[in-house]
Amino acid sequence: MLKAFDSKADVQAAPLPPAKAGNKKAQRNEPQFNPRTECYRILGVDLTSVPGFASPTVLVLLCELGPEFAEKFATAKHFGSWLGLCPDNRITGGKVYSVKTRDVKSRVAEALRLGAQSLCQAKNYFGDLYRRWKARLGSPKAITAMAHKLARVLWHLLEYKQPFNPEVFAKEEAKLQRKKLQRLHTMAESLNYRIIPIQ
């Protein structure tokens, strides 16, 4: 079935780098082909390089949405709203009545939620962000918020056909660390203390 899709990447001329080795054991019902390579050939972007996106998740996205789905949504916000992952703000007369997400039955949204949940122990920007949201919002809301972020990342990668660049998020993490350090210095000064870095 996947062979019927047109190729957007030449896997012979530009092969994928080897997948990271993990502790996952081989499953009995694993496909007899390389889903990572096939999805890369069809989509033109290696989505498995995004934290939280394993080959089964990408296969679900491809089967449910097709290879050209990014063109069907004007912006990443439209895509997130269609999935029911963003808040459905109901405001009347300046009063907020509800900010809950809409009840949307979508296999894609469920796949993104599973991908978000897999980041609970990830040692990267997405894992740190998920744990911060979980501490502040609780697990269900943190999973939905992270799934929404993954959906936006997914749309941008497929819309602009650009590979995932972790350095973009590394800059965000460095910016957050600077803000944390500034808050610590401010708190220490308010208590007549001074923070000295360890040499």
Could you tell me what each predicted segment is?
Residues 1-199:
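A detector of single, family-specific signature residues
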